[in-house]
């Protein structure tokens, strides 16, 4: 679904979204609105209706490296918004309300050997803040960026990834918030000619975390890979919404998201709930497009819900390939039986299957410390699963 600045919603087809920097151009979301129908609006603490007034501060720390420039800029900086236009009211509210933005620029021809680490600390419990972050990789540059979120509070932000011609950016976006955090994040990626983006989202913590990622190509030959890993526990709502907008020839996109869910039979909190919505639009002029998207969800216990909605809209016959797949279910009984027949205990067999399920994503993360951290986090969640099973 491509974003159309200032257009009427009624004039748009299924593959196009209204977009505006003006929060008043959007109606207050309701439960029947397509882009909000899975989101628990009552748990957003007013981020969606304008009643959440900023009263805190988010802390952003960027590691310093040669060839990388970090700036704190005001609202009037002309670079802000070049990556994309807000397509929902919360993103527009965040764009209208942030006080300063962090801009990280990788210079032309710069090959950054070690990851750029960006630590984002929440405003603290009871506080509300709006933010803006832009990552730009100039022509022929290359970088790996890890954006790590921790802490508490209520937060809405826009994050821009601008990858200029023949540049390469790998970004690992991690939400490891405290259990009380509400975070709505809109990601806007713009790829130049022959640019490459690897966008990986990892969602582990938080009460409500919703990430909306829009990817656009501004020239031919772009290559975007969007990977996601999420593990939802009791009381969590984790939502991922993707749009890959193909409007230029010979571009590629590959989407693979995997999630696991577990509940707590004695808890009074809402059931664990994950949402994945993947939209791909191929315009008439986007000949030679090659795209595929997959979402898999592994249900570990009762008391959970996983919604998965892939959408593919093709407006030209001259493509290399396009497809999507989605599946939600429990452990494969045949795989479990095979491991048990080899003398492996049931708990260990389940652990091995979950490790294998997520291994396809984890193996593609180019930062060893992040891989190790994710493996440890998954092991911790599985320990919780086993302890609840034993208690019941």
UniProtKB/Swiss-Prot annotation:
Pfam families: SUFBD_core
Similarity section: Belongs to the iron-sulfur cluster assembly SufBD family.
InterPro entries: Fe-S_cluster_assembly_SufBD, SUF_FeS_clus_asmbl_SufBD_core, SUF_FeS_clus_asmbl_SufBD_sf, SUF_FeS_clus_asmbl_SufD
Superkingdom in the source lineage: Bacteria
GO BP, sorted A to Z: iron-sulfur cluster assembly
Cited SUPFAM superfamilies: Stabilizer of iron transporter SufD
Record's protein name: Iron-sulfur cluster assembly SufBD family protein ML0594
Record-annotated disulphide pairs: none
Lineage: Bacteria, Bacillati, Actinomycetota, Actinomycetes, Mycobacteriales
């Amino acid at each position: 679904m491509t974003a159309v600045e200032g257009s009427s919603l009624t004039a748009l087809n299924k593959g196009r979204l209204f977009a505006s920097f003006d929060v008043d151009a959007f109606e207050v979301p309701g439960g029947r609105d397509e882009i909000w129908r899975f989101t628990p609006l009552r748990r957003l603490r007013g981020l969606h209706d304008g009643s959440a007034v900023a009263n805190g501060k988010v802390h952003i720390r960027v590691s310093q490296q040669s060839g990388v420039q970090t700036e704190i800029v005001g609202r009037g900086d002309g670079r802000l918004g070049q990556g994309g236009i807000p397509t929902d009211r919360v993103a527009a509210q965040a764009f209208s309300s942030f006080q300063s933005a962090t801009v990280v620029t990788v210079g032309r021809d710069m090959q950054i050997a070690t990851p750029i680490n960006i630590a984002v600390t929440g405003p603290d419990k009871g506080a509300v803040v709006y933010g803006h972050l832009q990552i730009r990789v100039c022509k022929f540059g290359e970088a790996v960026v890890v954006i790590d979120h921790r802490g508490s509070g209520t937060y809405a932000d826009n994050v821009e990834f601008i990858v200029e011609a023949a540049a390469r950016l790998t970004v690992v976006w991690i939400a490891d918030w405290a259990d009380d955090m509400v975070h709505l994040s809109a990601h806007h990626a713009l790829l130049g000619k022959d640019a490459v983006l690897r966008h990986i989202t990892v969602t582990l913590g938080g009460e409500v975390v919703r990430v909306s990622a829009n990817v656009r190509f501004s020239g031919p030959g772009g290559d975007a890979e969007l990977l996601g890993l999420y593990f939802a526990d009791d009381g969590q709502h984790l939502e991922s919404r993707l749009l890959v907008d193909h409007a230029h020839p010979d571009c590629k996109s590959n989407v693979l998201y995997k999630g696991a869910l577990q509940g707590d039979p004695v808890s009074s909190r809402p059931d664990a709930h994950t949402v994945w919505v993947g939209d791909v639009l191929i315009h008439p002029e986007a000949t030679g497009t090659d795209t595929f998207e997959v979402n898999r969800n592994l249900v570990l216990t009762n008391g959970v819900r996983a919604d998965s909605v892939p959408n593919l809209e093709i407006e030209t016959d001259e493509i290399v390939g396009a497809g999507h797949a989605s599946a939600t279910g429990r452990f494969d009984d045949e795989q479990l039986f095979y491991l048990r027949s080899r003398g492996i205990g049931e708990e260990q067999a389940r652990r091995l299957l979950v490790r294998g399920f997520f291994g396809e994503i984890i193996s593609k993360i180019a930062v060893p410390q992040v891989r190790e951290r994710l493996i440890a986090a998954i092991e911790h969640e599985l320990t919780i699963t086993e302890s609840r099973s034993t208690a019941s």
